[in-house]
């Protein structure tokens, strides 16, 4: 690895630790962190080859992002942010790249955040959005549900809820840096806590405090879908970085899902931190991750 490349990784990790991870360890109010995160994410360049249109589905604000080519499949993405951060603004650039790389339509939404909207408001809103897509005439076989970090938690929870009506199950599931165990028992939370440039244990703990009400425990499968019955899930792509504190959430999901005969495509990216896909403009691992998503999504379209 060339010196310039090493410096780029070091500089980026240092910047993320200073501007995002460290502030997240200070127990700041969500309203203090949200605008800062929105502004920082403006640094990510949007792909100019796609069209962005504001939409509203089931009363939830969102965006429809279309590539130039006509696509038969739609990616419904649920953003991350520890259940109390994240927005259309923070993830717009990644969504434009996702639409461009897959040449598929992408929908993402501003679902209700904790603590103003604790469990189950987020998952209920996301379920309603999915139902609204079906009402519009979009077929489940043409939908891929996607999510990053806590958004992957909600994406998996949505898919598990849809098992009650198998005819509504999407064609595939994409879990980027998934956060699936709110009991925080994964070993990687300890051994990677100094290596993950973006996400801190304190941020996860704050999110749990904001998200859960007194009548639901962190180990409840409704909020920790890793503990649910995974049988019947569609083909699933899991992407995780080797430096993530959530690394073992992905590994544990892979093991349990494969035991349930779920077709799992597991991708590990060396040296990457939580939500590294957002950095695809600068790092080859993140660019490769989008290529892997496109390959996975296209394979579903061919089935």
UniProtKB/Swiss-Prot annotation:
This protein's UniProt keywords: Hydrolase, Secreted, Serine esterase
Active site: 149, 244
A Gene Ontology cellular-component term: extracellular region
Motif (Involved in the stabilization of the negatively charged intermediate by the formation of the oxyanion hole) on chain: 79-81
InterPro entries: AB_hydrolase_3 (IPR013094), AB_hydrolase_fold (IPR029058), GDXG_lipolytic_enzyme (IPR050300), Lipase_GDXG_HIS_AS (IPR002168), Lipase_GDXG_put_SER_AS (IPR033140)
Compartmental location: Secreted
EC class of the enzyme, as a word: hydrolase
Molecular-function annotations in GO: carboxylic ester hydrolase activity
Miscellaneous remark of the record: Acinetobacter lwoffii RAG-1 has the ability to grow on simple triglycerides such as triacetin; mutants defective in esterase lose this ability, but retain the ability to grow on acetate.
Protein name from the UniProt record: Esterase
Originating organism: Acinetobacter venetianus (strain ATCC 31012 / DSM 23050 / BCRC 14357 / CCUG 45561 / CIP 110063 / KCTC 2702 / LMG 19082 / RAG-1)
Lineage of origin: Bacteria, Pseudomonadati, Pseudomonadota, Gammaproteobacteria, Moraxellales
């Amino acid at each position: 690895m060339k010196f310039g490349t090493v410096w780029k990784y070091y500089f980026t990790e240092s910047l993320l630790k200073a501007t995002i991870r460290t502030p997240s360890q200070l127990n700041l109010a969500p309203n203090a962190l949200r605008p800062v995160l929105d502004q920082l994410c403006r640094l990510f360049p949007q792909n100019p080859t796609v069209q962005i249109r504001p939409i509203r589905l089931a009363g939830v604000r969102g965006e429809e992002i279309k590539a130039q080519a006509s696509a038969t499949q739609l990616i419904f993405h649920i953003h991350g942010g520890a259940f109390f951060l994240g927005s259309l603004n923070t993830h717009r650039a990644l969504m434009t790249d996702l639409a461009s790389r897959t040449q598929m339509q992408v929908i993402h939404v501003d679902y209700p955040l904790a603590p103003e909207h604790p469990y189950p408001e987020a998952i209920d809103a996301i379920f309603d959005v999915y139902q609204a897509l079906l009402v519009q005439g979009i077929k489940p076989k043409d939908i891929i549900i996607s999510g990053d970090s806590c958004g992957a938690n909600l994406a998996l929870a949505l898919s598990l809820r849809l098992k009650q009506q198998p005819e509504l199950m999407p064609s595939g599931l994409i879990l980027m840096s998934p956060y699936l165990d709110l009991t925080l028992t994964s070993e990687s939370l300890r051994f990677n806590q100094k290596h993950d440039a973006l996400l801190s244990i304190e941020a996860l703990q704050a999110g749990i405090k904001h998200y859960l009400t007194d009548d639901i425990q962190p180990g409840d499968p409704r909020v920790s879908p890793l503990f649910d019955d995974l049988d019947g899930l569609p083909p699933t792509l899991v992407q995780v970085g080797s430096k993530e504190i959530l690394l073992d959430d992905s590994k544990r999901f892979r093991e349990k899902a494969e035991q349930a005969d779920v077709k799992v495509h597991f991708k590990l990216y060396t040296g990457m931190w939580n939500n590294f896909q957002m950095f695809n403009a600068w790092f080859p691992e993140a660019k490769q991750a989008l290529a892997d998503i496109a390959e996975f999504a296209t394979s579903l379209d061919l089935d």
